[in-house]
Amino acid sequence: MTSPEAADTPFEPKKILAQLPHMPGVYRYYDATGAVLYVGKARDLKKRVSSYFTKTQLSPRIAMMVTRIARIETTVTRSEAEALLLENNLIKALAPRYNILFRDDKSYPYLKLTAHRFPRMAYYRGSVDKQNQYFGPFPSAWAVRESIQILQRVFQLRTCEDSVFNNRTRPCLLHQIGRCTAPCVGAITEDDYAIDVSNAARFLLGRQSEVMNELEQKMHAFAAELKFEQAAAVRNQMSSLATVLHQQAIEVGGDSDVDILAVVAQGGRVCVNLAMVRGGRHLGDKAYFPTHVESALTLAEGGLGDEADGVDDAAAAMPDQPVEGEGDGDGGAAARVAGAGAGASVEAEVLDAFISQHYLGNRVPPVLVVSHAPASRDLLELLSEQAGHKVSLVRQPQGQRRAWLTMAEQNARIALARLLSEQGSQQARTRALAETLGLECDDLATLRIECFDISHTMGEATQASCVVYHHHKMQSGEYRRYNIAGITPGDDYAAMRQVLTRRYEKMVELAAQAAAADAATGIDGESTRQAEASSLLPNIVLIDGGKGQVEIARQVFTELGLDTSMLVGVAKGEGRKVGLETLVFADGRTPLELGKESAALMLVAQIRDEAHRFAITGMRAKRAKARQTSRLEELDGVGAKRRQRLLARFGGLRGVVAASVEELASVDGISHALAEQIYKQLH
């Protein structure tokens, strides 16, 4: 049940607090504009929310947030675990300013073995199903592809698409170099291939020694039967496997699946390094950098805000979570997780946020090795409940796990140092550009730059790109592509006019509507919508082009009533060499040649190159799609479903063109008469 406080009534904390129940749930704080400030959970909503307004020793950040609260909403849940799950979903959806946020990375790669009678080994991203076998997740695409190469070398499983597999008449190059047993042409029986698939799966699950022993027995059996050629093939397989195991000897431990989480804070930023061990193999790591840490609350459950008499209980509860299956000397006290207590650190809060946002809704390994004790005592229980198996946290590991944690902490420090260095250089470049262009900006982090580029191939598949630079970095989530239509092919000026009009016309209309609403209601000052529209307008608009392109942009901005001083063209220098560009202005200022050593020009070139990359990749994809599908789309009697069946059956347009009438007629939904018609239209 959700209980919102009406937005049109004065905010009276005492009245609201008196109505709150002593039940678990989630609370949300809003400011006067309706923006979400903070989302939290509680075992007891009344005591938790009341603590924000009754405590006198609030930190400056918490006190600042409390002064901005204009509305409170609460949702009662059946349990605290349910509240934790709802809190996580709301944080991801609403991105409150005072919550620690991690990028929602749901696209971890997996290694997939398909359910085909000759299973295919493939790189995969997306949701998993029960039909196929999935191994992972892996921390990077490189880790998956490395594993695929290992399995190709040792077990020679196929990697080709089913459409290619079904249409091969002779082995491919991978068979010739010993990377595939060519099941497509019957070079291996289904039973023998199934054995290789089983061995590959056990290898990925960390049962390498078991696979090696079975291969050795198989080799001796072949030799005893005087099948020396088969025995030699198994020997070579064992040799390849032994080489792989030797190369990974440092990485292989006794654990099957373990995640290592190291949190490091420095220079006002925090890094979480996640290292993954799958099947006993250390697959690498990935660094995460949360946002809103500088304004996030240092409030752990059981800390400042929960029931006072429950603080000690919260601190004492976490050590009662033993770690199962400790075979490397982690036993005793080291196998338990210490409670965070009332004084939860920033690292503990960040770890809480990461575990909640990363694992809830995703696969969880049975063991998490952590550098800090998490602040929430309920997190472990919820993870175990969701995963369907016990999830253990190890705070003070020993042996191989200790080495893994130390390495993760070191990598977190390195990644954080690199980030701080890059941020420093980016901030210097932003400052240099603002000074060069004479911009007055109190907070350089709010400086917003948008850059436009046009891309096409001899007038074909024209696309415009818009990339955004904000908060000292490229904001890929705000990139946009625009399909350009209704112009003369190859007319870059018309394309630029169209994209600028489409981009900024809506913003101007929104601001005008908000201003009209203010006038009608008698409200003094900008409305929220008008403020939002104004905040989206950039401080600088970069145009990839010279005087002609800038003149078109000036005309569009004049028609829309926008300030033309923000328009800057980036004219390429002699030979298109970086550092020789000239900045061209729409308001009549003298063009600038900054030189290749200029920090301002480095930033301009970085943004311009990103706009070009984004435009050209979109244009190529659009062109390829048009060329691949255009001929099939023109076929009479062939709709989307039949076209999809043809492409799946023959592996692409080239295969459809090469197919005979009989082969075309063998496709489901294609009659012999239609097959003849298709054949005639394609030849």
Curated annotation (Swiss-Prot):
The gene is uvrC. Residues 22-100 form the GIY-YIG domain. InterPro entries: GIY-YIG_endonuc, GIY-YIG_endonuc_sf, GIY-YIG_UvrC_Cho, Hlx-hairpin-Hlx_DNA-bd_motif, RuvA_2-like, UVR_dom, UVR_dom_sf, UvrABC_protein_C. The keyword DNA damage applies. Keywords: Cytoplasm, DNA damage, DNA excision, DNA repair, Excision nuclease, SOS response. Transmembrane segments: none annotated. The keyword DNA repair applies. GO terms for cellular component: cytoplasm; excinuclease repair complex. Interacts with UvrB in an incision complex. It is found in: Cytoplasm. It comes from the Bacteria. Belongs to the UvrC family. This is UvrABC system protein C. Residues 209-244 form the UVR domain. Its main location: cytoplasm.
